[in-house]
């Protein structure tokens, strides 16, 4: 099992309930694929360094997980498809 840090940015025009449901959905994707979520940090709404898909702001989420690569690959695949996530990155943490 490896440690990963996932950072994703949610589009700013979502209401709180929809944003929370999105976070839960993606956390469940990780859990269903055998990942153990060790920490979830909500950085809140922040200004982007540059415009992404005509948005100047976004809600930042940081998720630390311990999992096999399969779970992170599925998260990555679904995040690419989702219109609600405007940017994401997955980083493998060093041991």
Curated annotation (Swiss-Prot):
GO BP terms in the entry: translation
SUPFAM superfamilies found in the cross-reference section: Ribosomal protein S6
UniProt GO cellular component terms: cytoplasm; ribonucleoprotein complex; ribosome
Record field: transmembrane: none
Short name of any one Pfam family annotated for the protein: Ribosomal_S6
Keyword Ribosomal protein: yes
A single MF term (Gene Ontology): structural constituent of ribosome
The keyword RNA-binding is annotated on this UniProt entry: yes
Keywords associated with the record: Ribonucleoprotein, Ribosomal protein, RNA-binding, rRNA-binding
InterPro entries: Ribosomal_bS6, Ribosomal_bS6_sf, Ribosomal_S6_plastid/chlpt, Transl_elong_EF1B/ribsomal_bS6
UniProt function note: Binds together with bS18 to 16S ribosomal RNA.
Family the entry assigns: Belongs to the bacterial ribosomal protein bS6 family.
Designated name of the protein: Small ribosomal subunit protein bS6
Species for this entry: Geobacillus kaustophilus (strain HTA426)
Gene from which the chain derives: rpsF
